[in-house]
């Protein structure tokens, strides 16, 4: 009987944690494959020369550059494979963390795990591109916190979710679109006939503003009041000389080959 109980405990432990371990390590499968001379190298160059890089691009993806510069100071952070490992582990931690949270709250954990594996398999950009991935990590965290806030009526979590989404704007300005996550709050309030929806909205907005002010405050303190507006103006001005930065060009770049060769 004792042997069976011990075997059941071991089986339960493996059943619980092996899927988590796979999600954690799966992004490492290609860390030693090839050399990327495009976005991967561009991002690593920004981290390595963060203190002397062009201010426009430093501020355009500020929090991503700060995190990348910090990772590059870790052991082997001055090597390509070392940075691949560190940044890929961030992806794995995010996926494993999301799975651990969702399997406790949703049915069919196997389907959740398969969905996480599919999402990891579709990550096309190099993991060192933190200006993309850090925004994804923050959005994932915000969604999980917001889900907890909605299902448990936790006002603090509304604020925390807002803070996380505000920080995401410091990663890259287009992440301001993540503010659309207020729509599920309103939809859930409509479904549950929640009369406190307006207060919850204010909690979210307050947290969002607070999260937004943190990176902006650091930028203003270090680079001056005009630094961020000048960066925005410079980025918008690039569409005059670099047509591939226009929104229409970016959209056509995604679908151009399909249209051309279909």
Regions found by a protein language model. Give the residues of each.
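Membrane-interface transmembrane helices that cradle and orient dolichyl/undecaprenyl
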Residues: 103-106, 142-158, 195
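Extracytoplasmic catalytic/substrate-binding loops of multi-pass membrane glycan-assembly enzymes
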Residues: 28-46, 55-71, 77-78, 223-224, ...
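Membrane-interface alpha helices of multi-pass inner-membrane proteins
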Residues: 123, 145, 157-175, 179-184, ...
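Membrane-lumen/periplasm interface segments of specific transmembrane helices
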Residues: 201-262
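Juxtamembrane segments of multi-pass membrane glycosylation machinery
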Residues: 52-56, 67-86, 94, 106, ...
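Short acidic/glycine- and proline-prone juxtamembrane loop motifs at membrane-interface regions
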Residues: 127-136
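Perimembrane helix-loop-helix junctions
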Residues: 145, 151, 177-212, 217, ...
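Transmembrane-helix signature of polytopic, membrane-embedded enzymes
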Residues: 98-121
């Amino acid at each position: 009987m004792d042997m069976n109980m011990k075997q059941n405990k071991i089986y339960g432990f493996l059943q619980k944690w092996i899927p988590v371990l796979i999600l954690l390590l799966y992004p490492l499968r290609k860390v030693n494959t090839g050399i990327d001379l495009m976005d991967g190298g561009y991002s690593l160059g920004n981290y390595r020369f963060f203190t002397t890089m062009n201010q426009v691009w430093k501020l355009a993806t500020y929090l991503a550059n700060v995190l990348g510069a910090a990772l590059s100071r870790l052991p082997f952070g001055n090597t390509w494979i070392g940075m691949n490992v560190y940044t890929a582990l961030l992806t794995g931690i995010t996926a494993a963390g999301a799975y651990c949270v969702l399997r406790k709250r949703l049915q069919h954990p196997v389907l959740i795990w398969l969905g996480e594996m599919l999402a990891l398999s579709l990550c096309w950009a190099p993991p060192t591109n933190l200006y993309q991935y850090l925004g994804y990590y923050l959005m994932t965290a915000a969604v999980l916190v917001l889900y907890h806030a909605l299902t448990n009526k936790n006002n603090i979590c509304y604020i925390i979710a807002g803070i996380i989404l505000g920080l995401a704007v410091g990663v890259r300005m287009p992440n301001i679109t993540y503010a659309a996550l207020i729509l599920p709050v309103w939809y859930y309030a409509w479904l549950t006939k929640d009369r406190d929806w307006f207060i919850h909205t204010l909690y979210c907005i307050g947290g969002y503003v607070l999260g937004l002010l943190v990176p902006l405050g650091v930028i203003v303190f270090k680079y001056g009041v005009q630094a961020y507006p000048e960066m925005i103006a410079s980025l918008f001005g690039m569409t005059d000389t670099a047509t591939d930065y226009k929104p229409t060009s970016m959209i056509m770049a995604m679908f151009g080959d399909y249209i051309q060769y279909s």
